[in-house]
């Protein structure tokens, strides 16, 4: 039978519940347990797919095509279990499900209320999510409850967790509470009162935490831990200090050293083997002792909020681990390039344009791509970054001066990139597809396997085929592919049934390393294995640095 660990947060948001939950999962997995994780989001949106990156950060896409919270990316990077749609749900999904049942008459005319109907539905979603784990029936399901204790939005989820713990019985569920212990500089000391009040809020609704994870900018002294223990009614050895670390991959060892996994296993009556965190120690060793160094420019419009590119940043870090290369990322606002030109790119070892939506800043990105192509600087374009690379090539090499995407110019006569409902076929006729067509609507989501053209750089990187995740509405228009190929561009991978361009590259006779991909490879990169595309990109960046005669 699956046992549950509920992870809650107090005092303020953004303390790192997702990292804490993922780190605990990594330790338990290293002890031979099958583990899955779930994220419960209190917002009323059905999913984060249409939420602004400035509000929500990255949208992480699962293999089965769900648009989910970025914490699911942390989960997949820390453990081997893959996440699915069922691993993340929101208040919006819960209410949508309950209202649908009420309309069907499932409640037999009863008054539908938060308790028991909403809380019962939350429990059903939790158990369904745990049961859908790709590792088979998990020994432990770690459930991260979003928001902050005391917020009205989180109350139904906390109440559902309390009821579920009671229903499952002793030693079947436990609670881990992450809270802030701030350092007040004027007083010169850490303050425990916010933590005391946060635990008090939990106890008011009937939840007694078994473990406190106390976040601070430094290790919490024993005297303060004893004080927290006494006022929170939590054993002293279960008051665990979580201080700021320069790498999230140090957190599993930090928590294990203080006995978190031992406490959880004792509470849940589990007797697994000892933890083996040697992999994490090796990763940290590689991280702290690189042999080389490169600087990669990430050109985008969300550069002030790096949470928007969380998986991409981590994928570059993974590549740094597996190439013994420190990767310095410079975030460059594409609108600044539009205003000031490409001089800010000239010291870079490589250029990357990530995915995105909307017209703002696109001409700056295209200017950066032109610079990378003409200056022989390694270039990686992801999703929109590939589409813009195709547009730049069409304009500046093929001579299609009005080449554009209908996302940015709906009237352009040279629709090099377009919605699937806006394509022109080879005869110049509009090719229309509807919701009933094989591709569904205007957004392509989830994993798809595609064959790779032999003899290409893509084959050197991936092998015979590529299986990656997608999240996009627009595609390269097949009508223009013959002209692009005549200009030298190579379509190195296509979807097997629709023949859609998935990867493009320039031959080495034109450029040493210029690759665009329609999918999002960052979603499948892990610290354990890295990712072949990002490893190749970082190696190309270092080769470019050496070729320019810059000291490594």
UniProtKB/Swiss-Prot annotation:
<keyword id="KW-0547">Nucleotide-binding</keyword>
<dbReference type="GO" id="GO:0003883">
    <property type="term" value="F:CTP synthase activity"/>
</dbReference>
<dbReference type="GO" id="GO:0019856">
    <property type="term" value="P:pyrimidine nucleobase biosynthetic process"/>
</dbReference>
<feature type="binding site">
    <location>
        <begin position="14"/>
        <end position="19"/>
    </location>
    <ligand>
        <name>ATP</name>
    </ligand>
</feature>
<dbReference type="Pfam" id="PF00117">
    <property type="entry name" value="GATase"/>
</dbReference>
<feature type="binding site">
    <location>
        <position position="227"/>
    </location>
    <ligand>
        <name>UTP</name>
    </ligand>
</feature>
<feature type="binding site">
    <location>
        <position position="407"/>
    </location>
    <ligand>
        <name>L-glutamine</name>
    </ligand>
</feature>
<feature type="binding site">
    <location>
        <position position="356"/>
    </location>
    <ligand>
        <name>L-glutamine</name>
    </ligand>
</feature>
<feature type="binding site">
    <location>
        <begin position="151"/>
        <end position="153"/>
    </location>
    <ligand>
        <name>CTP</name>
    </ligand>
</feature>
<feature type="binding site">
    <location>
        <position position="473"/>
    </location>
    <ligand>
        <name>L-glutamine</name>
    </ligand>
</feature>
<keyword id="KW-0067">ATP-binding</keyword>
<keyword id="KW-0315">Glutamine amidotransferase</keyword>
<dbReference type="GO" id="GO:0005524">
    <property type="term" value="F:ATP binding"/>
</dbReference>
<feature type="domain" description="Glutamine amidotransferase type-1">
    <location>
        <begin position="295"/>
        <end position="547"/>
    </location>
</feature>
<dbReference type="Pfam" id="PF06418">
    <property type="entry name" value="CTP_synth_N"/>
</dbReference>
<feature type="binding site">
    <location>
        <position position="71"/>
    </location>
    <ligand>
        <name>ATP</name>
    </ligand>
</feature>
<feature type="binding site">
    <location>
        <begin position="191"/>
        <end position="196"/>
    </location>
    <ligand>
        <name>CTP</name>
    </ligand>
</feature>
<feature type="binding site">
    <location>
        <position position="13"/>
    </location>
    <ligand>
        <name>UTP</name>
    </ligand>
</feature>
<comment type="function">
    <text>Catalyzes the ATP-dependent amination of UTP to CTP with either L-glutamine or ammonia as the source of nitrogen. Regulates intracellular CTP levels through interactions with the four ribonucleotide triphosphates.</text>
</comment>
<feature type="binding site">
    <location>
        <position position="227"/>
    </location>
    <ligand>
        <name>CTP</name>
    </ligand>
</feature>
<comment type="similarity">
    <text>Belongs to the CTP synthase family.</text>
</comment>
<dbReference type="GO" id="GO:0042802">
    <property type="term" value="F:identical protein binding"/>
</dbReference>
<dbReference type="GO" id="GO:0046872">
    <property type="term" value="F:metal ion binding"/>
</dbReference>
<feature type="region of interest" description="Amidoligase domain">
    <location>
        <begin position="1"/>
        <end position="270"/>
    </location>
</feature>
<dbReference type="InterPro" id="IPR004468">
    <property type="entry name" value="CTP_synthase"/>
</dbReference>
<feature type="binding site">
    <location>
        <position position="144"/>
    </location>
    <ligand>
        <name>Mg(2+)</name>
    </ligand>
</feature>
<dbReference type="InterPro" id="IPR033828">
    <property type="entry name" value="GATase1_CTP_Synthase"/>
</dbReference>
<dbReference type="GO" id="GO:0044210">
    <property type="term" value="P:'de novo' CTP biosynthetic process"/>
</dbReference>
<dbReference type="GO" id="GO:0005829">
    <property type="term" value="C:cytosol"/>
</dbReference>
<feature type="binding site">
    <location>
        <begin position="384"/>
        <end position="387"/>
    </location>
    <ligand>
        <name>L-glutamine</name>
    </ligand>
</feature>
<keyword id="KW-0665">Pyrimidine biosynthesis</keyword>
<dbReference type="InterPro" id="IPR017926">
    <property type="entry name" value="GATASE"/>
</dbReference>
<feature type="binding site">
    <location>
        <begin position="191"/>
        <end position="196"/>
    </location>
    <ligand>
        <name>UTP</name>
    </ligand>
</feature>
<keyword id="KW-0479">Metal-binding</keyword>
<keyword id="KW-0460">Magnesium</keyword>
<comment type="pathway">
    <text>Pyrimidine metabolism; CTP biosynthesis via de novo pathway; CTP from UDP: step 2/2.</text>
</comment>
<feature type="active site">
    <location>
        <position position="522"/>
    </location>
</feature>
<dbReference type="InterPro" id="IPR029062">
    <property type="entry name" value="Class_I_gatase-like"/>
</dbReference>
<feature type="active site">
    <location>
        <position position="520"/>
    </location>
</feature>
<keyword id="KW-0436">Ligase</keyword>
<protein>
    <recommendedName>
        <fullName>CTP synthase</fullName>
        <ecNumber>6.3.4.2</ecNumber>
    </recommendedName>
</protein>
<dbReference type="InterPro" id="IPR017456">
    <property type="entry name" value="CTP_synthase_N"/>
</dbReference>
